[in-house]
Regions:
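Beta-rich carbohydrate-recognition and catalytic domains
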Residues: 1-139
Length: 139
């Protein structure tokens, strides 16, 4: 028997948390979500990624954002920079037949925990990542 939700998105396996960075691009809904892909309990947060054309049937894509030296990946949002105002994408070069790529930009909170003199300290900062193929992100 399958006990998975029929309408609500759920990851294929392990911990899932808040939805983040939902955006609609060229007929597809992109859903990012806090996710710990290695266990069923809370752990170092990543951003999972799934896409849907109808909000009912979802395809889970590779992990979008991994924890790094700045910390775990917490809440954030996304924007599709269709006009490449940020300059993070590429531009059209018509005489060479090159079509530019607009970036999908993720803005999120990096959460780092350190210990100094036995005391736990937390540092949060805003971070940015972008993708020109809507799957693989550069930080």
């Amino acid at each position: 028997m399958n006990y998975r939700p029929k309408v609500h998105f759920s990851a294929k396996k392990n911990w899932i948390n808040d939805p983040n960075g939902m955006v609609y691009i060229d007929g597809q809904y992109h859903l990012f979500f806090q996710h710990y892909p290695h266990a069923m309990n809370w752990g170092p947060m990543h951003w999972g990624h799934a896409v849907s054309r109808d909000l009912l049937h979802w395809e889970e894509l590779p992990i979008a954002l991994y924890p790094d030296e700045l910390g775990l990946i917490f809440s954030g949002s996304c924007v599709f920079d269709k006009e490449n105002i940020s300059g993070l994408g590429s531009v059209d070069i018509p005489m060479l037949g090159v079509k530019g790529k607009a970036p999908l930009i993720a803005m999120y909170t990096s959460h780092l925990v350190t210990f100094e003199n036995g005391e736990r300290k937390s540092l949060e900062q805003q971070s940015i990542a972008y993708s020109t193929d809507l799957v693989h992100f550069e930080k």
